[in-house]
């Protein structure tokens, strides 16, 4: 129900538990727990660009996210502001590294949907201009909030929810655990679900 948005659900608890099991290298429990969670009605969002926009909050891929908003009394989240384009949408911290940019395969559309660039115009019509000649030229799409949705009373991006766990994470946890258990076919199938969305 809408009243439960932002609350920890059984799916979120199982998803986080499967991640803990994976970190503990208990691959059997990670596989079993993530498999149980995969049968709970979550799905991949077919539009990668939609995932991290405010319109994509609490979508089918959302397993757990922190609900943020603007309150005159308390302000809002600074997550997007800290990482936003310097002197335009934020402070410009935690920017994509060249290593991240080089990790994408040629032609992978996720690269352009992950990295904002100086001089780019977003699909919402915002021109990315850093305003500070010493600032970097790349920024994270994950924290971009269209200027039309900003509330100056709370700071840039104060409404942007924090995505803690997505269904794609669960598929990848399941894939890694399956691979470690020798079930390479299941691992490849789940990796390809994420890659081919």
Give the positions of each predicted feature.
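Active/binding-pocket-proximal capping segment
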Residues: 37, 168-172, 181-197
């Amino acid at each position: 129900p809408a009243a439960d948005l932002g609350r920890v659900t059984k799916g979120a608890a199982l998803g986080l538990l499967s991640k803990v099991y994976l970190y503990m290298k208990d691959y059997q429990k990670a596989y079993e727990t993530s498999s149980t969670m995969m049968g709970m009605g979550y799905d991949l969002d077919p539009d990668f660009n939609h995932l991290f926009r405010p319109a994509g909050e609490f979508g089918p891929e959302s397993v757990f996210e922190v609900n943020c908003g603007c309150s005159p009394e308390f302000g809002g989240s600074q997550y997007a502001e800290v990482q936003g384009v310097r002197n335009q949408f934020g402070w410009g911290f935690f920017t994509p590294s060249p290593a991240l940019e080089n990790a994408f395969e040629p032609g992978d559309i996720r690269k352009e949907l992950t990295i904002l660039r100086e001089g780019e115009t977003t699909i919402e019509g915002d021109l990315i201009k850093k305003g500070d000649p010493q600032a970097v030229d790349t920024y994270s799409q994950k924290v971009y909030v269209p200027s039309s949705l900003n509330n100056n009373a709370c700071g840039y991006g104060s409404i942007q929810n924090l995505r803690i766990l997505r269904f794609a994470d669960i598929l990848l946890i399941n894939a890694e655990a399956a691979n470690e258990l020798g079930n390479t076919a299941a691992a490849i199938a789940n990796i390809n679900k994420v890659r081919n969305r």
